[in-house]
């Protein structure tokens, strides 16, 4: 029996809601598979749910959601017409730290399944942690949180098990108040505008010139394995 995309997506949500891969599953209220239009060519990925997200079962609720919606509006994008999810889908009573490998590694199959299911034209990476786990972990690039600011506004092309993906990198909306890079919001909005133009052109079958960084998947070094717990 061939399932429709809607049925496959429903199955994905049910699997996420029933997940007990890591200890966070015992303290969450609502595991968050995602929200928005599942048929969208655009997928937005943030770090992890906060308390209000967990209470409402909605991705990017509260102030972070308002900031993201504001940026999308400036790029002439509709929040409800894109699909949003998190790298970690359960609230831990606080934000998970990067060193908590269990949460990120256990949730990784859900993210990969979502990418395979959606096969989005564009993936928007919100912040340092999704950037590290979805892009850097497959390469030999080493970028710390300070170095990440140089990547905001850039586009990365990476070939993975779900196909070639264009990642558009923006600052996470919850971190936009930082003084470290006062231009992070404007660079993020420009990245969203570039992403929209790319998606529209792709849908029309038109040429889509993009300034991209090509990253190839490579074996991890011993240092990366020890530092980040990557295999």
What would you call each of these model-derived segments?
Residues 2-217, 228-231:
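A polyanion-binding, active-site-adjacent surface
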Residues 225:
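Cationic, low-complexity basic patches in intrinsically disordered or flexible, solvent-exposed regions
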């Amino acid at each position: 029996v061939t399932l429709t995309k809607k049925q496959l997506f429903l199955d994905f949500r049910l699997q996420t809601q029933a997940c007990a891969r890591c200890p966070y599953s015992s303290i969450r209220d609502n595991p968050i598979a995602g929200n928005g239009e599942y048929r969208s060519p655009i997928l937005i990925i943030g770090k992890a749910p906060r308390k209000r997200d967990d209470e409402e079962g909605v991705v990017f609720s509260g102030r972070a959601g308002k900031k993201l919606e504001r940026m999308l509006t400036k790029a002439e994008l509709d929040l409800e017409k894109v699909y949003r999810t998190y790298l970690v889908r359960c609230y831990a009573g606080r934000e998970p730290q990067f060193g908590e490998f269990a949460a990120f590694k256990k949730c990784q199959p859900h993210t990969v399944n979502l990418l395979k299911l959606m096969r989005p034209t564009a993936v928007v990476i919100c912040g340092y942690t999704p950037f590290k786990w979805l892009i850097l972990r497959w390469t030999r690039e080493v970028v710390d949180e300070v170095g990440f600011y140089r990547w905001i506004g850039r586009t990365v092309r990476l070939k993975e098990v779900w196909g070639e993906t264009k990642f558009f990198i923006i600052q996470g909306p919850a971190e936009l108040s930082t003084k470290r890079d006062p231009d992070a919001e404007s660079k993020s909005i420009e990245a969203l505008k570039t992403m929209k133009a790319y998606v529209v052109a792709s849908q029309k079958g038109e040429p889509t010139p993009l300034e991209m960084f090509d990253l190839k998947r490579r074996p991890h070094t011993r240092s990366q394995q020890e530092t980040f717990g990557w295999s």
